[in-house]
């Protein structure tokens, strides 16, 4: 049972859009959902992790890199996607923590060809997994551009050591209805991941990149 109404969320989103239009900043503002949890012990309780694909791109400028086999290297070149082949990954190596950290900061998400995905732990160690950026499988039957778009439309929740999370759920070039739908879908999915559902949620806020926070719950 959801504890927030769609009317309430739409009204808040309307306010966000109004503020963003009045301020007219020189870049595309992202809409962010900020979550504070309670009654959760990150040392004892299982740290949840999950992702949901929503109806629109949440962050158009989200950067994606493909760990590509030869066929995917050719496809990435054709569509202008960023990629690294197996030789480039071997050059980094699993012990070069500094380079792996730099790679994980440079890109928001990773895709990998099947033959390379299996080797990622051996090639790069556990670094990408630790920061919640382990690559998603890209098969040869999938269209690379569509798959990259799917990644840009995915909201990921991963609890680390602190009881607060922030995720992008849209941007101000979407319609108000689209952003409101994304927020509701994301919240309901998050609740399904939590041990005690709504009882684990302390507060929920939404805000644009530079705007004030608005409390949803």
From Swiss-Prot:
Give the modified residues of type N6,N6-dimethyllysine.
Answer: 122
Alphabetized UniProt keyword annotations? Methylation, Ribonucleoprotein, Ribosomal protein
The record's Gene Ontology cellular component field reads:
cytosolic large ribosomal subunit
Output the Gene Ontology terms for molecular function.
RNA binding; structural constituent of ribosome
Would you kindly state one Gene Ontology biological process term found in this protein's UniProt entry?
translation
PTM sites of type N6-methyllysine: 122
Q: Which PANTHER family did the record assign?
A: RIBOSOMAL PROTEIN L7AE FAMILY MEMBER (PTHR23105)
Per the record, the similarity remark reads:
Belongs to the universal ribosomal protein uL1 family.
This chain's protein is named Large ribosomal subunit protein uL1
């Amino acid at each position: 049972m959801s504890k927030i109404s769609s009317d309430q969320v739409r009204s808040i989103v309307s306010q966000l859009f109004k503020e963003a239009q009045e301020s007219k900043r020189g870049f595309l503002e992202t809409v962010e959902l900020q979550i504070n949890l309670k009654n959760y012990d990150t040392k004892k309780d299982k740290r949840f992790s999950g992702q949901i694909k929503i109806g629109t791109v949440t962050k158009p400028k989200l950067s994606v890199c493909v760990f590509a086999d030869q066929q995917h290297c050719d496809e990435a070149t054709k569509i202008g996607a960023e990629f690294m082949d197996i030789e480039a990954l071997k050059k980094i190596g699993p012990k070069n923590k500094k380079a792996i950290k730099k790679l994980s900061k440079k890109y928001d998400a990773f895709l990998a060809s099947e033959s390379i995905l299996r080797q990622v732990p051996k090639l790069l160690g556990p670094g990408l997994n630790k920061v919640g950026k382990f690559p998603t499988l890209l098969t040869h039957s999938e269209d690379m551009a569509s798959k990259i778009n799917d990644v840009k439309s995915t909201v990921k929740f991963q609890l680390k050591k602190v009881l607060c999370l922030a995720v992008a759920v849209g941007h101000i070039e979407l319609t108000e209805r689209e952003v409101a739908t994304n927020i509701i879908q994301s919240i309901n999915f998050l609740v399904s991941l939590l041990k005690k559902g709504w009882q684990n949620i302390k507060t929920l806020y939404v805000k644009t990149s530079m705007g004030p926070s608005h409390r949803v719950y």
